[in-house]
Amino acid sequence: GVLSNVIGYLKKLGTGALNAVLKQ
């Protein structure tokens, strides 16, 4: 449902931010 989509989106954002930090 919508909640699953939101959670998936937040996880994607969190992973992207984490990867950006680790690459620095």
From Swiss-Prot:
Main location: secreted
GO CC entries: extracellular region
Key words of the record: Amphibian defense peptide, Antibiotic, Antimicrobial, Secreted
UniProt keyword Metal-binding present: no
Tissue-level expression: Is synthesized in the stomach and stored in a novel granular multinucleated cell in the gastric mucosa. It is stored as active, processed peptides in large granules within the granular gland secretions of the skin.
UniProt key word Transport: no
Protein's cellular compartments: Secreted
A single GO BP: defense response to bacterium
Role according to the record: Antimicrobial peptide.
Membership in a protein family: Belongs to the gastrin/cholecystokinin family. Magainin subfamily.
Name of the molecule in the record: Antimicrobial peptide PGQ
